[in-house]
Structure formats: C-alpha cells, structure tokens
Design a protein with these regions (language model features):
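Protein-protein interaction/assembly regions in multi-subunit complexes
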Residues: 1-244
Length: 244
C-alpha cells in the first residue's frame, strides 16, 4: 500500500481481524455423545472449524425476529458416527451444498468400540469483535524499506552476505532492497566506513501480511476490509453533517 499513513494502515488491519463477517458454528445440539471428550470441548472444536461459504448469499440473524432463521442466515451440520474410528470434518453433513469445512481431514474426536457421536450444529455469520471463532484473519503490516548510500562501501561483499533475508543488492553506487527486508539493520552495522549506509522504513508505504484463518481467501478479506472502511468513513461524514 502506497501514499498512505500508519493510522489508515492500522484501521485496515483492525477491520481485517475483527469486522469481516465469517460463517462459524455457534450452537451444537447433542443427541448422543459417549466419547472420551465432553460436549463442551467438542462444541468448541466445531466452532473453530473454518467454513467455505459465499458471503454474498448470507446475512446476519438480526435481520429476523428473535428465534427466527432462514437458509440465508443459518446452515445446519449433522454428524452421526459410530466407533471405532476418528470423526473428521468430512463427516459433517451440511444442509447447504455450497457450505462445507475448508479441510476434510481435521480430526474432531476419536471414537472407540460401542461409542457414538450424534449431533446437529448450526452455523451463522459473526465477526471477530464479538467472538474469536469468527476472526477472519491474522493481519500485520510493516514499513517498506528504503535505503540511502553516502559514499562508497569498502566491504560490499560482506554487507550483502550478512543480510539474513538476502534482501540487499549492491551494484557500484546503486543499492536495492526488496520486500523481504525486515529492517534488522545488520547491513548498516557491518557497513564500512561507519554511517555510509542507512536503511529506514518509509511511513507512507506499507507491506501487509494477511493470513486467513477462515474459509475466505486473503484477497477477499482485503477487499471486504476496504469496503467496510469506506462505509465507516461515509457514515462518519453523515454524522458530522448532522452536527452542522
């Protein structure tokens, strides 16, 4: 991201982590469970299973009267399995063919002989600000590295070699640093003469790292975060006009 500032970058980061709507299991109704794990622990595991879904086809439950739901705000998963064997996410049967666990091989619980797990779990939209099961991603950012060279380095090879990220390249009086640079400044400390090389972070350019921990792709999370931030700015502008 370029031509911006830390305040804007941090607002975007916070939205990615806490305000992107995610479909996650909220309630679990157990009909039978005599496994080694008690109901609450299995329910907790199910709540953290990432689900693939189309966010355009779902809305929040609060659009309905309390206690009422529809196929666009709730998806029901059923598990009915007998031991012995391991219950995986592939054993979760969905009421909506377009909604399923992101991975089929996530273990839920191991069943031994004469043990059975039968349940229904309902998934609905939520955001990370309200519950950890609905967090879309882990997002962070850092400044884009910029380099300044004053004078000629006496130990070019040593400076290039000491970089742990292999991110610096020097060709005569030209120095290039790629995005892998984490501003550790090992090259700066090694530079001879002292002070001839300087690497700083550009506070108007940012490198984002977005790791999805949900059924959404990182690019989907970024685009949704931008849309949400735009809406917040627009709503804020309306409130300011009311003051006038």
């Amino acid at each position: 991201m370029e031509e911006s500032n830390p305040q804007f970058a941090n607002a975007l980061r916070r939205i990615m982590m806490s305000e992107i709507p995610i479909l996650a299991i909220e309630y679990v109704d157990f009909s039978m469970n005599n496994s080694v794990l008690y109901n609450e622990l299995i329910a907790h595991r199910l709540g953290l299973v990432p689900l693939v879904f189309d966010n355009k086809k779902f809305h929040f439950k609060d659009k309905h009267d309390k206690g009422k739901t529809c196929s666009m705000c709730e998806v029901v998963f059923a598990i009915n399995k007998k031991g012995s064997g391991i219950v995986y996410t592939k054993d979760m049967k969905s009421s909506n063919p377009d909604v399923k666990p992101l991975y089929d091989n996530i273990p839920i619980v191991e069943l031994f002989d004469n043990q059975k797990l039968k349940l229904e779990a309902s998934a609905s939209l939520g955001i990370g600000k309200d519950h950890a099961r609905c967090q879309a991603a882990i997002a962070s950012y850092r400044y884009f590295p910029t380099v300044k060279l004053s004078g000629k380095l006496a130990n070019v090879d040593e400076v290039v070699k000491i970089c742990p990220k292999h991110a610096i390249k020097i060709d005569g009086n030209k120095v290039d640093v790629d995005m892998n640079c984490d501003l550790c400044k090992e090259c700066v400390r090694k530079a001879d003469p002292e002070g001839s090389l300087e690497i700083v972070g550009d506070s108007t350019r940012f490198i984002f790292n977005v790791e999805s921990i949900s059924g959404l792709k990182p690019e989907e999370i970024v685009f949704q975060a931008v849309d949400i931030l735009k809406k917040k700015v627009k709503d804020f502008g309306k409130e300011v006009k009311k003051i006038k």
